[in-house]
Amino acid sequence: LRPLVSSVAEAAGVEPPALRVRLQERKWGCCTPKNGIILNVRLLLAPKIVIRYLVVHEVAHIRFRHHQESFWAEVERLMPEYREAERMLKEDGWQWVF
């Protein structure tokens, strides 16, 4: 995951964030106040497109701490196909819960 996080951060023009992977009950990922990223260990069961989307989403939060239009424009710039990954996460995410 670290090479993916580093490459997305470089494309976003931000410093590569610290990465932690742990079991989270309610979230797939989050961006910490100190610009670190925490990803849910359950993502390891998800397709690569979904993992990439979550990394892109959280890296975008380093620059945009909201879900306004500018945030989504950055997500789309970094991953034009993000809507498909988001759909997969919403429809199929239950399958990756153990």
Regions found by a protein language model. Name each.
Residues 58:
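Walker B catalytic acidic pair
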